[in-house]
């Protein structure tokens, strides 16, 4: 169990890393620079993390865990969970976009679509299909990657389309494939 001082130090480091990621890629961020921006000494940094990449992984893990927790209640309340999921991502789009830009895309996609609440949505889609197991696997992968690309482009845009419009686009694509 972490005490308050540890939580504050980690929060300052996370905030500092996110601030730096807005300016440059992860591989150009040094521990020295991160600690200066975070106002935390390097000894404290190394007490909890081995590298900025390790800190970024923790930020991603926290984001995914929070997303899953928030989505569980949304999915329980709605048969069509797509709109609540998109609303949630829109509300957290700055962090989502930073993570997707800062991590290998395949790794981020694998983590995102392995979240239990998101897996449930896609599993429900697979249950509706009449395709063989092999076809379902490839169609599902295609939908995952296409959905991620749509989300990335949508959330990175200067003036994103309304959530309902993106939900409609994804629903139309899903119906065409499934």
Locate each region found by the language model.
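Residues within the helices of the helix-turn-helix
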Residues: 32
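An amphipathic alpha-helix adjacent to DNA-recognition modules
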Residues: 10-18, 27-28, 36-39, 46-75, ...
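Cytosolic nucleotide-binding catalytic cores of signal-transduction proteins
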Residues: 23-24, 130-131, 175
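N-terminal intrinsically disordered/low-complexity leader segments
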Residues: 1-6
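Flexible coil/turn residues that form the inter-helical turn or adjacent wing/linker of helix-turn-helix
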Residues: 24-27, 159
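Helical hydrophobic small-molecule/effector-binding pocket
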Residues: 76-122
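Amphipathic alpha-helical packing segments from all-alpha helical-bundle domains
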Residues: 105-149
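C-terminal peripheral helix-coil segments that are non-catalytic and often amphipathic
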Residues: 145, 153-178
